[in-house]
Design a protein with these regions (language model features):
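Detector for outer-membrane/organellar transmembrane beta-barrel domains
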Residues: 275, 280-404
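Outer membrane beta-barrel
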Residues: 89-120, 126-258, 274-287, 328-332, ...
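Outer-membrane beta-barrel "beta-signal"
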Residues: 416, 441-454
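Sequence/structural signature of outer-membrane beta-barrel proteins
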Residues: 111, 153, 168-173, 202-208, ...
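Sec-dependent signal peptide recognition
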Residues: 2-8
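N-terminal periplasmic/intermembrane-space "pro-region" immediately following the signal or transit peptide
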Residues: 18-117
Length: 454
């Protein structure tokens, strides 16, 4: 409630300030026009006295300066007025161009069996733990999202941008959700050499693609890996032909691990490792047919987590690594095939291994492999369609009884644009989760949504 009041108050103040800025610029423009007209009249009177005959009007430094200021003010007012639409909110802070963006999303979800965790599907609970007839209904607006894109003026060929983005999946009650941090980074780009440095929190380089699902988790825990974390990233691009590009990215990222075995209340095993995780990706983009481009990439990471085993200084390091391939392949004008395959170990913080990292009973990393494939159709008129499948398959030899041994899902959805800004959609999916030495769990999931983009 406090945040809602603050947000409304901020919006009110922002809009008032925005209007005041336009009004102030208009007044300045009016004053400058009057000054120019007065100077022109005085100059004309003096000229008529000295030279009665007609002659071309001379240019003066003062007049040129005032005309230039007047032109710049007119251009600035025109730019502000064009950007003042409620659904394209831009404003200037000094010389920074700041754009507000996001969407409001309302979801209604029915599950035929207990899904973890209802609002967003990860996996299905085992029939031995939960009655298989225990269906669920969820209503939520937590995926509502907003952010700010920030752009500074180009300076000596260097482009500086930033992003801040949040949603409401930060915990709290179902009707009192908390804000959650998604992105916050600065990016400096040398345009001539196509080299950039990024510092802050954003997506992993590992397996960078996502399928288009109405379910918030985009097949994470059932075939799609990769998340967000703090990082320092270096990127370089090369033009290798007409509409073709090679790109290389490398990043030092924070190692986000499980809570420590000995001190779970305050010590993170990734933090305790004492050094960052290394991520990298190489990608190529090539034109195919119908002026559409295909992209291919290979990516991966390596890091370590340190678990304290006792209070005498005994500890054990656990590796975390991955290797992934990604592809985007246009098939026709509005049809594309996208997907990823991967293999790795200790992938819980990357939403792999069905969110299992280390077998703490056997003190062993959990290996896993998986991937996903999606067919995307549209937009065709006001419609868009998606079909896809994903699977995450941990190594049974690394598991203890009761741990998740496989998780897969298949889905189909459609979106329809009611207006330029408002979209409705529906999705049906089937989920099946296997367990080591326990019964499986499966569920049919029906998901409807309404979205207002801004």
């Amino acid at each position: 409630m406090k945040f809602s009041f603050f947000f409304l108050f901020f919006s009110f103040c922002f809009l008032n300030a925005f209007g005041d800025e336009i009004q102030s610029l208009r007044q300045e423009n009016k004053d400058l026009k009057e000054r120019i007209e007065l100077l022109e009249r005085s100059f004309q009177e003096l000229k008529n006295k000295l030279e009665p005959q007609k002659s071309p009007e001379p240019e003066t430094p003062l007049k040129s300066l005032l005309q230039q200021e007047n032109k710049e003010l007119l251009e600035r007012i025109d730019r502000l007025e064009k950007q003042s639409s409620p659904l394209n909110m831009k404003f200037l802070k000094g010389k920074l161009d700041i754009t507000l963006y996001g969407y409001i999303k309302a979801d209604v979800i029915y599950d035929s069996a207990r899904i973890n965790n209802g609002n967003i599907a990860y996996f299905v609970e085992s029939e031995e733990r939960i009655d298989q007839e225990d269906d669920q209904l969820n209503l939520t607006a937590n995926q509502t999202r907003f952010g700010f894109d920030i752009k500074a003026p180009l300076w000596e060929g260097i482009e500086t941008t930033g992003k801040i983005e949040m949603d409401f999946y930060g915990g709290g009650g179902e009707n009192t959700p908390h804000l959650r941090f998604r992105h916050a980074y600065i990016k400096v780009h040398w345009k001539k050499s196509d080299f950039s440095i990024l510092a802050g929190q954003t997506f992993d380089l590992v397996a960078p693609l996502n399928p288009d699902t109405i379910n918030f988790m985009v097949l994470c825990s059932s075939g799609n890996i990769g998340y967000r974390r703090p990082q320092i990233r270096l990127s370089k691009g090369w033009e290798i032909g007409k509409n073709s590009k090679l790109s290389l990215d490398a990043a030092f990222t924070r190692t986000v691990g499980n809570t420590n075995l000995l001190y779970p209340e305050y010590l993170d095993a990734g933090e305790d490792s004492g050094f960052p995780t290394i991520q990298g990706r190489a990608g190529i983009c090539l034109p195919l047919w119908m002026e559409k481009s295909a992209s291919f990439g290979i990516s991966g990471h390596w890091g370590q987590e340190e678990y304290d085993l006792d209070n005498q200084g005994k500890n054990k390091d656990f590796d975390s690594w991955s290797l992934a391939l990604d592809i985007t392949l246009p098939l026709y004008e509005n049809i594309a095939l996208r997907g990823e395959i991967w293999i790795g170990k200790n992938l819980g913080s990357y939403l792999g291994g069905v969110q299992q990292t280390v077998n703490k009973t056997r003190l062993k990393e959990i290996s896993s492999q998986g991937g996903w494939l999606a067919l995307e159709i549209g937009p065709i008129s006001k419609w868009k369609y998606n079909l896809g499948f994903g699977m995450d398959d941990p190594d049974d030899e690394d598991l203890s009884p009761g741990m998740r041994s496989k998780n897969w899902s298949i889905y189909g959805n459609t979106y329809y644009s009611l207006t330029e800004y408002c979209t409705i959609g529906g999705e049906i999916s089937y989920w099946r989760t296997s367990y080591e030495s326990q019964k499986k769990g499966d569920s049919i999931r029906l998901h409807g949504t309404m979205i207002l983009n801004f």
